[in-house]
């Protein structure tokens, strides 16, 4: 049987319901190392906030969805997950307004504990105490795997000892180049992205140019590290693997970090008129970055930035606050494979592709690298459906517009 395509609104509603219900069932605390790789309620809460964010965003075409209500729902979940305000089962599920089955049937289907009612309050401290920001210069190291900042992490190593080790590469939007000295995500940042890092200490751990920084040589006697001298002049270096850290093949992939959720929450707070609270929330992430410039940070010696030039975000009106939060998110998550989806949900993908086409990068070899030149608005935001799937459906599945 071939199932016809659901509408975008139906799809989002299904995902949202699934995540809300899963929060009732998943473990509230983080898993121990021997259990690592399993998702807990914190991961589901982070994903729910991200789904609600997309539903509220201008680039997601949901004409029958109240986007203001979705912003408020992001804030509601953020107050539970981040600020520790308890929430009722009814408010979590939106049961009264969205369910047609009885509570008895629903609670039995979900295998909830006996005595759980719609008025049962969920203790926020169970999840709030499980996640926090880790040190920025450690979260992408081997030692940073399964840190309190990690909400969803794909386990590539068998910590349980039952012989199921999977030696895959990372599941990122790019491919990994392996050599004896290092491993690097082979997707090149733009010079425009690099310019966003002016006076930001996170640049050292995110983007590198052809100059070889001593930070990356501290673990090797080799005076040069090959990938700095490859064709592209800029490289993402967040996932650099020092020789002492072993093979890149067993590195985990963090799907979602607590820092991203803080910035999602900050954006939502600003959208519902709480701009000062939004700035305070975004500054939790920015203040963590400032710790890279602390005198007691051993990696400060590799920085060329003065702590006096890196300041917290200031309180400002809505538009300025929104731009500042989006910029903070772009910097914090650069090189983690989220940017394309970010500009699509913001509704600015067409103008960003035009910018790339109008400002082509020139390689050190002299070759022009053109991106965005053939982008078609309203078509290329999504991929085509494989034609074989369209064919075997006998007309039930229709190809995406423009393909």
Predicted regions and their residues:
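Generic N-terminal initiation segments characterized by hydrophobic and/or small/turn-forming residues
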Residues: 169, 190, 307-310
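Short, cationic low-complexity segments
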Residues: 172-192, 199
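Extended polysaccharide-engagement surfaces of secreted carbohydrate-active enzymes
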Residues: 155, 159-161, 166-172, 187
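Acidic/polar-rich alpha-helix caps and helix-coil junctions
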Residues: 1-158, 163, 201, 205-403
């Amino acid at each position: 049987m071939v199932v016809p395509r659901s509408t975008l609104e139906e799809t989002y509603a299904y995902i949202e319901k699934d995540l809300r219900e899963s929060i009732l069932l998943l473990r509230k605390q983080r898993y121990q190392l021997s259990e690592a790789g399993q998702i807990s309620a914190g991961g589901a809460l982070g994903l729910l906030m991200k789904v609600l964010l997309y539903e509220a965003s201008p680039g997601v075409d949901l004409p029958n969805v109240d986007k203001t209500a979705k912003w408020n729902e992001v804030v509601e979940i953020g107050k539970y997950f981040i600020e520790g305000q308890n929430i009722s089962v009814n408010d979590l599920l939106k049961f009264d307004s969205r369910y047609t089955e009885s509570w008895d049937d629903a609670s039995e289907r979900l295998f909830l504990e006996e005595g759980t009612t719609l008025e049962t309050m969920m203790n926020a401290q169970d999840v709030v105490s499980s996640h926090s920001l880790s040190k920025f210069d450690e979260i992408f190291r081997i030692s940073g795997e399964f840190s309190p900042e990690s909400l969803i992490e794909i386990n590539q190593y068998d910590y349980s000892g039952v012989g199921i080790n999977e030696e895959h590469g990372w599941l990122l939007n790019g491919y990994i180049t392996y050599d004896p000295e290092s491993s690097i995500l082979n997707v090149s940042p733009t010079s425009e992205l690099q310019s966003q890092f002016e006076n930001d200490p996170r640049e050292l751990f995110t983007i590198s140019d052809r100059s070889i920084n001593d930070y990356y040589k501290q673990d090797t006697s080799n005076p040069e590290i090959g990938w700095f001298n490859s064709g592209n002049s800029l490289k993402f270096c967040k996932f650099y693997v020092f020789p002492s850290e072993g093979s890149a093949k067993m590195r985990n992939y963090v799907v979602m970090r607590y820092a991203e959720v803080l910035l999602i929450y900050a954006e939502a707070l600003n959208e519902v008129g709480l701009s000062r609270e939004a700035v305070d929330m975004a500054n939790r992430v920015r203040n963590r970055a400032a710790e890279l410039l602390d005198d007691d940070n051993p990696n400060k010696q590799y920085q060329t930035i003065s702590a006096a030039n890196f300041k917290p975000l200031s309180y400002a009106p809505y538009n300025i606050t929104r731009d500042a939060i989006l910029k903070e998110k772009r910097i914090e998550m650069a090189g983690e494979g989220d940017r394309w989806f970010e500009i699509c949900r913001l509704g600015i993908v067409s103008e960003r592709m035009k910018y790339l086409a109008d400002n082509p990068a020139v390689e050190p070899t002299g070759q022009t690298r053109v991106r965005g030149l053939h982008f078609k608005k309203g078509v290329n935001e999504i991929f085509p459906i494989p034609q074989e799937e369209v064919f075997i459906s006998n007309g039930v599945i229709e190809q995406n517009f423009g393909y």
